[in-house]
């Protein structure tokens, strides 16, 4: 399962490297962008959290949003991604999920590649 996850994340990174303009900002004017896989994974993660505890889904999304909005101030605290052998790809851990993101130093942006349920894939 982890190889399948790595492959999908790598495909999203490759898409970004080929066509940066195809990625949307997390919020207008932000230097955080998200991939299609991230959007799909967010919907699946929210559904999973809701199936476990319907009241927690709002807290999950709000806390994740807060982390992402403030991630630029804490980039150095995040560890190298377990899915890539690259110092420019790190993982944010949130409530049993990993959010791998790419640091595009040349453009000064961060790209959210996906959301992985750590308990299922590891």
Question: Could you say what each language-model-derived stretch is?
Answer:
Residues 1-9, 13, 21-28, 49, ...:
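Enriched for short, Lys/Arg-rich terminal
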Residues 6-63:
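Arg/Lys-rich, positively charged N-terminal/basic patches that mediate binding to nucleic acids
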Residues 19-23, 66-94:
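A short, surface-exposed loop/turn module that caps and links secondary-structure elements
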Residues 22, 52, 56-60, 79-86, ...:
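Solvent-exposed interaction patches of small proteins and small membrane subunits
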Residues 33, 45, 56, 74-86, ...:
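Sparse, context-dependent recognition of short Cys/His-centered cofactor- or disulfide-binding micro-motifs
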Residues 37, 41, 56, 78, ...:
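A broad, structure-centric signal for solvent-exposed, well-ordered loop/edge residues
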């Amino acid at each position: 399962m982890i190889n399948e996850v790595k492959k999908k994340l790598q495909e999203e990174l490759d898409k970004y490297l080929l066509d940066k303009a195809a990625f949307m900002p997390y919020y207008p004017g932000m230097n955080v962008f998200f991939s299609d896989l991230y959007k799909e994974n967010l919907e699946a993660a929210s559904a999973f959290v809701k199936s476990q505890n319907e009241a927690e889904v709002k807290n999950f999304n709000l806390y994740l949003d807060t982390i992402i909005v403030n991630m630029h101030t804490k980039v150095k605290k995040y560890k190298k991604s377990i899915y890539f052998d690259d110092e420019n790809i790190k993982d944010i851990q949130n409530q049993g999920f990993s959010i791998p993101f790419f640091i595009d130093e040349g453009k000064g942006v961060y790209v959210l590649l996906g959301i992985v349920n750590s308990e299922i894939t590891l």
